[in-house]
């Protein structure tokens, strides 16, 4: 049997820090970000289905979200101001991401490739799946801003404002529900979120 370096590469996502140009009270790596995006994307899909008549596969969306930044293990996490400095850079970075995604897919053993390729290659996502994952990704970045700001780090103030605009542009009923029901707790301390349910 031929060896594959696929999961050895993915395990290194924990070594790539997000927000590299920002001073962080607590650093966040791509691996933990991906888990949070997967949880939030799953919640958005479940809310969409249960409350607003959606027909999306919540489990598949959670998997897509789990792998949505996998290519960063080869490209690194390019800071947003650099990535979107102009349309040419954004377009070139998309091309680099596509190459990195294909390189990861090529690491998967042949007999498993048809399982993992549609999770890593974002071109295999439906528009609706892509939309939910993008909403979750932006929501998690927004939540990171709230956490940093609540810890007194004003470095994230402009990022929060920028992300509020992004969230407004990606707005959906399920996101509105998530924002109303779950996000307010991110402004509270551990004692405040624990007092209703003591152990």
From Swiss-Prot:
GO MF terms held by the record: 5'-deoxynucleotidase activity; metal ion binding; nucleotide binding
Family annotation (CDD domains): HDc
Gene Ontology cellular component annotations, sorted alphabetically: cytoplasm
Enzyme class: hydrolase
HD domain segment(s): 30-142
Residues where a divalent metal cation binds: 33, 68-69, 137
Record flagged with keyword Nucleotide-binding: yes
Required cofactor(s): a divalent metal cation
Site (Appears to be important in orienting the phosphate for catalysis): 18
Domain of life: Bacteria
Reaction(s) this enzyme catalyzes, per UniProt: a 2'-deoxyribonucleoside 5'-phosphate + H2O = a 2'-deoxyribonucleoside + phosphate
Chain sites annotated for binding substrate: 18-19, 33, 69, 77-80, 137
EC number: 3.1.3.89
Subcellular location: Cytoplasm
Alphabetical UniProt keywords: Cytoplasm, Hydrolase, Metal-binding, Nucleotide-binding
Functional description taken from the UniProt entry: Catalyzes the strictly specific dephosphorylation of 2'-deoxyribonucleoside 5'-monophosphates.
The family this protein is said to belong to: Belongs to the 5DNU family.
Oligomeric form and interacting partners: Homodimer.
The protein's name: 5'-deoxynucleotidase CKO_00504
Protein source organism: Citrobacter koseri (strain ATCC BAA-895 / CDC 4225-83 / SGSC4696)
């Amino acid at each position: 049997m031929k060896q594959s370096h696929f999961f050895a590469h993915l395990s290194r996502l924990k070594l790539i820090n997000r927000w590299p140009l920002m001073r962080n009270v607590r650093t966040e790596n791509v691996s933990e970000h991906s888990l949070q995006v997967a949880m939030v994307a799953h919640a958005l899909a479940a809310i969409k289905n249960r409350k607003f008549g959606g027909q999306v596969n919540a489990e598949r969306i959670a998997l897509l979200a789990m792998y949505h930044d996998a290519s960063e293990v080869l490209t690194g996490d390019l800071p947003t101001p650099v990535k979107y400095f102009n349309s040419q850079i954004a377009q070139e970075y998309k091309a680099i991401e596509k190459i990195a995604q294909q390189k990861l897919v090529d690491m998967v053993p042949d007999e498993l490739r048809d399982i993992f390729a549609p999770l890593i290659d974002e071109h295999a996502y439906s528009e609706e799946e892509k939309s939910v994952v993008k909403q979750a990704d932006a929501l998690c970045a927004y939540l990171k801003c709230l956490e940093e700001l609540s810890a007194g780090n004003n470095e994230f103030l402009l990022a929060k404002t920028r992300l509020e605009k992004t969230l407004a542009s990606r707005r959906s009923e399920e996101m509105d529900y998530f924002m109303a029901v779950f996000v307010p707790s991110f402004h509270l301390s551990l004692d405040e979120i624990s007092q209703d349910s003591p152990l």
